[in-house]
Regions:
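Active-site substrate-recognition segment that forms the wall
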Residues: 1-36, 40-126
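C-terminal lid/capping helical subdomain adjacent to the catalytic/cofactor pocket in oxidative enzymes
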Residues: 125-130, 134-179
Length: 179
């Protein structure tokens, strides 16, 4: 049994499904520690949160009261030269009161996004299982997809069949407009 679990790194390994994801770079930052009042102003219930914009912003507080903020992406093979500044500008659109706060860390990675933001989990005619297109939810969804594919390979396909039936459309142009 073969399983393709490449997410954004599928590239041209399997052309039948490569056009159904768009690899994008997504970035995060961590501010300097905020005092308790600042932290509660930003996130009074200390929960993970995100908005519903096309380019999603997401955030939570760390144990030491740093704002962990994700937002800002690009569609090239390179990360911005000043990642802290790049993400900071996006953060300030959401939290302008943090203008004077220092950014201690910034990082990023490449994710795979589907047109409808649903994960693409299925089986090719050749019998190859695949999962990708977690659209920024890969930490949780990739583990679930692995479990679902393992169940299907073991003959328990009920949950797999649900995802396999979800129609994932290809991006216009497929892989032609990629890096």
């Amino acid at each position: 049994t073969i399983v393709l679990a490449c997410n954004a790194y599928l590239e041209k390994l399997e052309k039948k499904i490569a056009g159904k994801i768009m690899p994008i770079n997504n970035f995060m930052l961590a501010t300097e520690p905020l005092d308790e009042d600042e932290a509660r102003y930003i996130n009074k219930d200390n929960v993970c949160a995100h908005d519903n914009k096309f380019h999603v912003h997401y955030f939570r507080m760390s144990q030491d009261n740093r704002l962990l903020f994700g937002g800002g992406e690009n569609y090239t093979t390179k990360f911005p030269s000043n990642l802290k500044s790049y993400v900071r500008n996006t953060m300030l659109d959401v939290f302008p009161k943090l203008e004077k706060k220092k950014i201690d860390f910034a990082w990023g990675g490449t994710i795979a996004v589907t047109v409808n933001r649903m994960p693409h989990i299925g089986k090719l005619d050749s019998g190859v299982y695949f999962s990708h297109g977690f659209s920024g939810h890969g930490v949780a969804m990739a583990s679930l997809a692995g479990t679902i594919m393992a169940e299907a390979i073991d003959g328990l396909s009920k949950r797999f069949d649900v995802f396999n039936e979800v129609k994932i459309h290809a991006y216009p142009g497929g892989t032609l407009l990629r890096w």
